[in-house]
Structure formats: C-alpha cells, structure tokens
C-alpha cells in the first residue's frame, strides 16, 4: 500500500512539474527562434558558446550544490539525522568556492579580451558574468534543499520567475539596446543571468523549511562530507569540461570543412539553439522524474529498502522507453515540417529525422543518471562520461572536416549509442533488476505500429481538409498519442502485479 501511494505521488509530481517544464522549454525554444531572427544565427552561436563556458565556470565554482543537497540531505532524513547541519556544510562549501572563483576570474578578466580579440567579449562583460557565479551556486543549493524536503513545486515556480526575468531582459536588450549599439550581445546575456539567478535566490530564501530535526545528531562530520562530495563534484566537473571542450571544437572543425567563421558560428548556433532543444523538448517528463527519483532512491538506499529501489527503477525505465519510441515515430513522420517551423528550412528537418533513432538513448540517459546519483555511483558516471566524450570528440574531429554539419550529428549519435548501452547494463546489474523485454520493447512496438497507422490516417485526413501544417502536427500527435497510450495500458494490465512481486524478491533475500 505504501509503495502504491509513493508511486502515485511520484507520478502526480512528475505530471505537474512536467507541465511547468513543458511551458519553460517551449518558451525557451521560442526565445531561441526570436534571437535567431533578430540577431542572426552567428550571434546565437556566440551566445551559446559563451554560455557553455559560463556553465563550466558555474559548475567548477559550486554548481554541484543541487545534487549534493538533494542527495545528502535526503540520506540524512532517511536515517533520522540532522539535515539542516548537512545543508550548512553544502552551502558554506559552495559559496566559499564560488566567491573565490568569481574574485579570481574578475582579477584576470582582461586576459580573454586580449587573447581572443572579440569586440563583444570585454573585461566588463566577463566581470558581470562572474558576479552571477555566487548567485548560481546559492540557487543550486536552495533548489536541492527543496527537493530533499519533497517541496518540489517551489523550485518549479522559481524557475518560471527566473526564466521570465532572463528572457525579458534579453528580449528588451535585443529590441532596444543592441541594435543602437548601446550594449553588446554578451553584456545583455550577463545582465539577464544576474536578473534570473537573483530572483531565484530571493524567492527560495524566503521559504522556511522544517526545523524539527535540528536537535538530532548529524551522521556527517565535515571531513566525511567532503570525502563524499568530491566524487559528486568531480563527476559534474568532468561532464562540464568535456561538454565545453566539445562545444569549442565544433566551430573549429567546421572551419576545417571550409566554412567561414560566421558560417561556422551560425551552424553551431542552429544545432545547439534549435536542433538539440527540439530533440530534448519532449524529454521534460524524464528530466523531472530524474530529479524526483534521486531523493527517493537515496532514502531507500539509506534504509536498505531494495524492494523500493527496484520498483522505482523498473517503472522509470518502462515509461521512458515506451515514451521515447513514440517520439521517434513522430520525428520520423513530421521531422521535415518541424524543421520548417523552427528553423525556416528543410535542412533542420533533415537533421532531426537523421537523429531520431538516438532519442531513446538520450531519454534513458536522463533517467539512468538519476538512478546512479540516487544510489551514489558517481564514480561510474565519471568514467562512463569520459569514455562517451572520447568517442564523441574523436568522431567529431574525424567526421566534421569530412562531412561538415552531418559530422556533428554523427558524433552525437555515436557517443549516445555507445555510452548509454553501457550505462543501461550497469544500472540493471546494480539494481539486480531483471526486466521483461516483452513488456519493455515488444508490447510498445505493437502499440507503436497501430499508432503509426492512426497517424498516417489522420495526416491524410487533415491534408484532405486543407488544414495548416502546424494544426496537422498537433492533431496527429494528440490522436495517435492517446491511441498509443490506451493500447499500452490495455496490453500491460495482465500479470503486472505478479511480475513485480516476483521481480522484487532477489535482493531482499
């Protein structure tokens, strides 16, 4: 009964938070399209590249606060300790590190301007970006604390406020200040960062958390906390370094293919600002679920409740695979039209259709990383990410000078297929889960075939009625999606309970 209530609670929170995320992701995609039309794809590529370096600086200077607070405070709550003391450890460490990093970067802010000779990247802009690093670290800690106490709607509200302020600041500068030369693109980006992060800190700092555990004995000493935090921080830092290295290499390899610097930045901006967000846009439910299962699994691990670990992992994997297969079908069917709507040309649609097969692996990665973080397996994540990015960067260096833009897509396909196959094997072995592949793959495939026929039928009907392309995509997605979900529900009903009872007897014994 308790497990059923937990499952329903997790599903309810996932649906509600996904609705927040869908809105934010959609608005973010619209913002990228707006910036591309107003400033040009090259400027968006420049913003994306500098944003990648900013993300690296934020993570290296204390950006691991979210996962640290979410996981370690949940473990402390699970064992009846003092989570408030753990939070003080996390906040003190992250704030000290971020303030030192911001001060150091401010001192040497003249160096990038001198080396790169970019008119938009001056010392003033770099110092503005550095000023937001402590705010970024504190907001990450505050969000992680909310997740640990299961007050998951508060970070969602704060993210809405943050996005509105960031997008509003950037849009205002784009319309009124940048065209007149009163402000550079990157200075506008820096101001939007400060406005957004500041709003999150202000909002979440006003929220009071339970203090009934403050008198309990903390199971963590500061030394033990640091020993457990270092793998978490190392994993986040490694991913950020590899991701930024990959982003920096993309324009360089496009130059080797024969593109001009402006064309290289424009193609990079189109890939990162339109194509990748379009692929990730449907994954908002997986992103929310991944954040929710980290504290759930951490509490189950602290209580040595292997039954709950298996239940949560199995349910998350099943839902993710079934959902991802439907998205693959939709991208294959309507990728060209989506590309025309988002990018204004058929080339974007061709790349979306080309990359559709990698969608299940992308969405599984989101969920599996949540499982690994919840169970404290950060060392494996670090090693796997290292191998994954070695594959990605190797393919990038080989294929982009030969094939241009298609080489970027090929590198993304190669690293996701290899890295997530290994990640899935490790998660199954770690949890002792014995998935029934008939339910995970065969039944969704049967339902998918039926949904595909419905989608083709509805598409022909809508075209006959001469409906706009956008309306055709929405109607087909809604009707075929409901049919797919209904068929899956009907064919998965028999024997579900008996399988789960059987599947959850291994580790307990």
Listing of model-derived features with the role each one plays in the protein:
Residues 1-27, 85, 219-239, 495-509:
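N-terminal membrane topogenesis motif
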Residues 9-67, 102, 106, 132-133, ...:
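Signature of the first transmembrane helix
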Residues 24, 32, 51, 62-70, ...:
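Short runs within selected transmembrane alpha-helices of multi-pass transporters and secretion channels
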Residues 26-44, 113-115, 177, 237, ...:
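Helix-terminus/linker motif at the lipid-water interface of multi-pass membrane proteins
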Residues 63-78, 279-313, 317:
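Helix-loop junctions and terminal segments of transmembrane helices
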Residues 91-115, 310-361, 393-394:
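Alpha-helical transmembrane segments of multi-pass membrane transport and lipid-handling proteins
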Residues 95-241:
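Hydrophobic transmembrane helix module of multi-pass membrane transport proteins
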Residues 235-241, 439-496, 505-509:
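Transmembrane alpha-helical segments of multi-pass transport proteins
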């Amino acid at each position: 009964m308790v497990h059923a209530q937990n499952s329903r609670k997790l599903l309810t929170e996932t649906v509600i938070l996904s609705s927040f995320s869908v809105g934010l992701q959609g608005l973010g995609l619209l913002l990228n399209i707006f910036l591309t039309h107003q400033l040009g794809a090259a400027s968006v590529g420049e913003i994306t590249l500098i944003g990648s370096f900013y993300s690296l600086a934020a993570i290296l200077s204390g950006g691991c606060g979210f996962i640290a607070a979410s996981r370690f405070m949940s473990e402390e709550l699970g064992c009846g300790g003092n989570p408030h003391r753990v939070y003080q450890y996390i906040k003190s460490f992250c704030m000290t590190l971020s303030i030192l990093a911001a001060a150091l970067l401010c001192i040497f802010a003249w160096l990038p301007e001198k080396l790169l000779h970019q008119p938009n990247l001056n010392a003033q802009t770099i110092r503005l970006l550095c000023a937001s690093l402590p705010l970024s670290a504190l907001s990450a800690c505050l969000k992680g604390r909310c997740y640990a106490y299961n007050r998951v709607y508060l970070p969602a509200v704060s993210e809405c406020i943050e996005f509105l302020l960031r997008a509003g600041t950037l849009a205002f500068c784009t319309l009124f200040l940048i065209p007149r030369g009163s402000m550079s693109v990157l200075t506008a980006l820096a101001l939007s960062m400060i406005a957004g992060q500041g709003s999150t800190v202000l909002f979440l700092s006003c929220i009071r958390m339970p203090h009934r555990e403050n008198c309990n004995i903390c199971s963590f000493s500061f030394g033990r906390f640091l020993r457990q935090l270092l793998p978490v921080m190392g994993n986040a830092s490694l991913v950020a370094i590899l991701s930024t290295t990959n982003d920096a290499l993309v324009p360089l390899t496009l130059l080797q293919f024969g593109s001009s610097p402006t064309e290289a930045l424009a193609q990079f901006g189109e890939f990162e600002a339109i194509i990748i967000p379009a692929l990730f846009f449907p994954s908002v439910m997986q992103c929310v679920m991944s954040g929710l299962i980290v504290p759930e699994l951490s509490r189950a691990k602290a209580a040595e409740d292997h039954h709950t670990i298996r239940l949560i992992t199995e349910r998350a994997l099943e839902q993710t695979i079934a959902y991802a297969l439907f998205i693959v079908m939709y991208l294959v069917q309507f990728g060209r039209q989506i590309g025309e709507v988002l990018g204004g040309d058929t080339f974007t649609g061709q790349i979306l259709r080309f990359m559709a097969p990698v969608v299940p692996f992308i969405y599984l990665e989101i969920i599996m990383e949540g499982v690994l973080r919840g169970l404290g397996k950060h060392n494996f994540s670090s090693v796997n990410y290292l191998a994954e990015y070695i594959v990605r960067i190797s393919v990038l260096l080989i294929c982009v000078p030969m094939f241009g833009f298609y080489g970027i897509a090929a590198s993304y396909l190669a690293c996701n297929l290899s890295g997530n196959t290994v990640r899935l094997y490790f998660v199954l072995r770690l949890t002792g889960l014995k998935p029934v592949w008939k339910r995970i793959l065969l039944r969704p495939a049967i339902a998918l075939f039926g949904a595909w026929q419905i989608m083709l039928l509805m598409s022909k009907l809508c075209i006959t009625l001469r409906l706009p392309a956008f309306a055709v995509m929405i109607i087909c997605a809604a009707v075929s999606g409901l049919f797919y979900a209904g068929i899956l529900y009907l064919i998965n009903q028999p024997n579900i309970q008996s399988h789960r009872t059987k599947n959850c007897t291994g580790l307990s014994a």
